[in-house]
Structures are given as C-alpha cells and as structure tokens.
Amino acid sequence: MAQDDSYEEKPEVISSDSGGSGYSTEIQIVGTVTSSDGSYVEYEIVHQKRSVWRRYSDFESLVKLMRRQYPAAIVPPIPGKQSLLSYAKHPRKAKSDAEFLNFRSRMLELFLRQCLLHPCIRSNPIFDKFIHSTVSWHVTLSSLDLPKDSNTDPLRLPPIATEHDPFAHLRSSMPLVMANSLSPPSSRALKPIHSLSNPSTASSLEPSSPLGSEDECHPPTSDMQPTHELNESPSTPTAPDFPHYNSSPSELSPTQRRSSISNGKDAPSPVLKDLTSYTQEVIVCRKFLHHSLSPSIHSTLSSISKMESCLSKLGSAFHSLTALNEIQLANHLQVIANAFEFSGMYAKEFEQEFNSSVYEKMVQSMQLAKCAADALKYKQLKIQQRDFLQDQLIHSNTMSATDSMVAASPTIHPATRLNTIQRAVVSQAKKGYTIFGRLQNVLHDFVEGETSISKESLQQHKNTIENQLAAANWDCQKIDEFMDAELKFYKECQTSQWEEIIKSVHECIYKWAQTNLQRWLRTREELENLSKDI
C-alpha cells in the first residue's frame, strides 16, 4: 500500500461531552491509504491516542448494523458512494482522487463525531470495537453472534436489539402495516398464528435504502458537477422545538382501550397528532432546502467557477497585449493581467472552501434529517401496529359474543351462524381500511369455503392477539423512554451543524473579498508608480 500524502491533517477537534456524560467527541481521520491495485482505500481513525484503519465498506456495514439494532434511533448517515458519472469519466482515478478522498474523509469524521454524541451508539460495544480494535472489521464481525437474517422487516424487530426482548418468540408473527392503510381482519384471521400477518398489508418502513442512493455530494470541479439524488423522504436541517409525547394508550388497561376504540371515534390520538405535526414540519423544511437552498448554492458555485475561468482568460488576454504596445504601456498591461489572474485564483479557492464548508455540510444535514424522519415514521407505524391489534381484539371479542349467542339458539343454521359473524366483522370495518384488503379477504374466504369456526380457534386467536398487543405496547413504551434523548441528539447535531455553516459562509466571503481588495489596492499602487515614470 502507498500512503496518500495529499491529505492535509486537520487541527484538533474541540472536545465536547454530551450532557456531561464523559463521552469525548475528539476523534479524527488523519490520513488515507490506497491499496497497491487501487481497488480500495483505508482511512486512519485516531481516538484516545489509538489508531485503527477502516475501509469505506466497513463504515457501510457499521451503519446497517446500527440501524438493525436500533430501528427507532436516529443513526447518523455516511457520505454516498462515488457517482457513476464521475467514475465513468475517471475509472482509474476514482479511488485515488485526492479531492474526493478529502471530501469523504471529512464526512466520515463528522459521522464518527455524531456517533460519539449519540445516546445509544456511543456505548455500543460493536461501535467501540470499530474505533478501537486493531483487528480487521471483517474478522470482528465474524466473531460476533449476530442474526443471519438481515431482511426482517423493522416492525418485527425490537426497538432496541441490545436489550433483553421478552417477546422474541412473537416477533416473526407480528402484523405488518402501512401508513394510514390497514386491512380489516376477516374469518381467515381465525386460522393459526402465521395467518395473522395480513399479506395485503406490508410495512412501508423498509430497511434503509442503499447508501449509494442517499443524498450525496461531490466536490464540484470544471469537469465534475456535484451529484446528490435527494429523494423526497421527509427531513429537515432545522432544529425546531420537539413536542413531548407519551404513549398514553399503552398505559390504559385492556378494558379502557377496548371501550375507547369501540366508541367509534375516528379522530387520531394525541400521540399520533404530535408525530404527524412534527413530521409535516420536517417535510416542509426539507422541501425548502431541496428545491430552493440547495439549487441556489449549487448555482452560486457554478457561477464562481465560471468567474474564475473568465478572469483567468482575461488575464491571459492582457498578457498577450504586452507584445503589441510600447514598453511603458506593456508594463501597465502586465500589472493588470497579473491582478486578473490572481482574482481568478482567489475565486477558485473561494469555490473550494465554500463547497467543503457550506455545501457538503448542508447535504449531510439533509441526510441526518432523513434519518430522523425514518425514526419518527417507525414510531408512527408502531402506534398503527398497536391500534391494528386493538381492533383485531375487538373483532375477536365480537365474534366470541356472537358465537355464544348462536350457541344459545341451536335452531340457527350453521350457514346463518357464519353470516352473523361475518356481518359483525364487516360492521367493525372503518373507512381507514382499503377496498383491496376487504376484497382480498372476501375472495380468500370464498376459496377456502369456510363454513364453521370452532370455539377453540376463536380463543386461540384471541390469546395470540392479546400477546401481540402486549408486545406492541412494550415496544411503544420502550420507544418513548429514549425518544426524547434521540430528538435532543438530533437537535444538538443540527444546531451545531448550522452554526458552523453560518460561520463558514461569513468567513469564506470575507476572506475572498479581503484578498481581492488587497490585491487590487496593490495593483492601483503599482499603476500609480508606473505612471510617475512615464
């Protein structure tokens, strides 16, 4: 491997503690090493006077692992992969481009600092091995007892996988829901446990999208413009006051929950209202950043790049005029040409600093906001999963009552008995359920040709729902216990990020204006001295 000396070591990061917890965020990426064949790059991480080397793919696996262990947490993002366009233009230099490696090093260092601020990740033993263990990351992962199934839906995972899960045996059968779209239970739900997960409903909270498709930016140059495909997931780089909410439904007794649902009120709970309101704020802010601020900054960078090119060409043009005039005038033209060339050089420096100090941090801020939106969405879906199970329990109780009524009237025909149960189920279906889900349930019952429902099946179904509802309530309670800390972490990260952005905007423009002013004041002085000699 060959050491890449083009990376300039940065000044020491200011140490800070999160709420006096003793976790220092003093961590750096001080260098990069490219493999001899150029196939990968390793980054040197220094923390607490210890140094380890990690590849970009190691960072990817760490993020995926943290998102699996903390589905309800705001896991900081890492920069995206090299764009296909830039790789197509420079296939052999993509891994060794100094400008791109510097950009990625800055963003990975920011990721590590945010992880050290995170209330859960900073004390995670796997993350500790990542920043301290000198053993290769592949070997470290092989030695850990991690679940092999990485495609499990997040709604079937505990909110915090690092703690004991008393409902682990129920996770695989937990129902999946979509945002604001649930299918009502039917008589087919009265089958064994595996049929509780309605195939017409699927969680819209899929595992995080591939990191290469996330918001990403690259240092813009004359032949490579920044590329960052910003999807429309809700996110925001602002730090508004976060509403405090508690899962009050989980604190009610089963009787109270059933009576509150059976009242027939369709108004959402205060918990869901708070989450919906905050998520809407996230969407509005992110749309402004995506459609207004980000394009404006990109346009500014492009204009600065064009200005640098024009100034350099203008300086060259003035240089060419020196051969066409007498010596005194040629000296004047030489001074002006030098001034224009220096202005072009200052514009190039201004473009690079503005990109690294402002644009890159803004994109990372949007990525972090997307992670926060995913955590809030997980919370919303957990509440909907719990409400869905509460509805199923009501339906099951209705069926039991109907079955008892029919048992007291033996003259009722079995087919009439089934229709009575079906009408009870349909009467509980509300407008929030999809037509497709109802139609699918009807077709399923028709094909199966069910004509009777045993009391044992009803009781087994009811017991299963009660156990799953207990698991959902436990999940919501766990999320509430650390959600305030998660939102506080998010607010601190975004506030710190935007304080740095505002400071960087001022410093970049002030430095550019000051150097240009000094250069042209010096040019005026030189021209005045030349004029005295004419």
Curated annotation (Swiss-Prot):
Comp. bias regions, Polar residues: 245-263
Alphabetized Gene3D superfamilies for the sequence: Phox-like domain
Database matches in Pfam families: PX
Keywords tagged on the record: Autophagy, Cytoplasm, Endosome, Lipid-binding, Membrane, Protein transport, Transport
GO cellular component terms attached to this protein's record: cytoplasm; cytosol; endosome; endosome membrane; phagophore assembly site; phagophore assembly site membrane
KW Transcription (keyword) present: no
Chief localisation class: cytoplasm
Family: Belongs to the sorting nexin family.
Name of the protein in question: Autophagy-related protein 20
